[in-house]
Amino acid sequence: MPKIHPTAVLSGDIELADDVEIGPHCVLSGKVRVGAGCGLVGAVHLQGPLVLGAGNILYPGCAIGFAPQDKGFAFHKEGAGTVVGDGNIFREHVTVHRATRDDRPTRIGDRNYFMACSHAAHDVQIGNDCVFANNTLFAGHAEVGDRVVTGGGAGVHQFVRIGRGAMLGGLCGASKDVCPFFTLSATNYIGGFNRIGMKRGGFAPADIDLVREMYGIVVRSRVPFSQRVARLETLAGHPLADEFIAFVKGSKRGISTRHGRATSTRAAASAEGE
């Protein structure tokens, strides 16, 4: 039997697993399904259509599934809603908005950690095992791969893709795609690749060396970008290289390299760390 605080308000088609705990002043509206082991600490607002998987913990002030911040979106339109996987943590005042589309929901994967005041806008697609520091912002339709880490105040432009294993530094902005395992150290400025993260993730030394080589081709080379892509294609056949090539060739907003906004101090620090 779910534990529901007497001050909580549930209205609509609400489906709760038997061990769900709902704290004081929570509000659940519309078609909402909450999976086993979920806990709503207090003052959490859930708006359907919303599917919340198992083992998610939501802290006070979280608002999940409300209408997009899109002036052309009718407030009462449901659309495809929001789908959240398992084992996620949403700290205080995290917001996730439902999709504008009818065929694909806003989607959050498994085991992600959203620190306080993070925001995932409408139609965002987020993978698994990510960590987003306070005030990280993902604009509409952004796509985020697995094991991405952001510093506080990082911002991602609409439709931008962040490849798996990438890192975005605090207060950094991305209006171009960030390749898998790259590190963003200033706005659209790649400062290196995530060697430590790859080691911690169990990648073999040969895999790390391959990513280092691809980083050199994409970021440090000064030949036209089409020639860089051609050089990448000579590495095809390795799973990491194939993933990387597909990511680069699939870009619609361009790839972050070393032509972004970086102070001389940060640029020098990045160069020393290579």
Name each model feature, range by range.
Residues 3-185, 189:
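Structural signal for interior beta-strand "rungs" in well-ordered beta-sheet cores
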Residues 1-7, 12, 18-19, 55, ...:
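Terminal amphipathic alpha-helical/low-complexity segments used for targeting or macromolecular assembly
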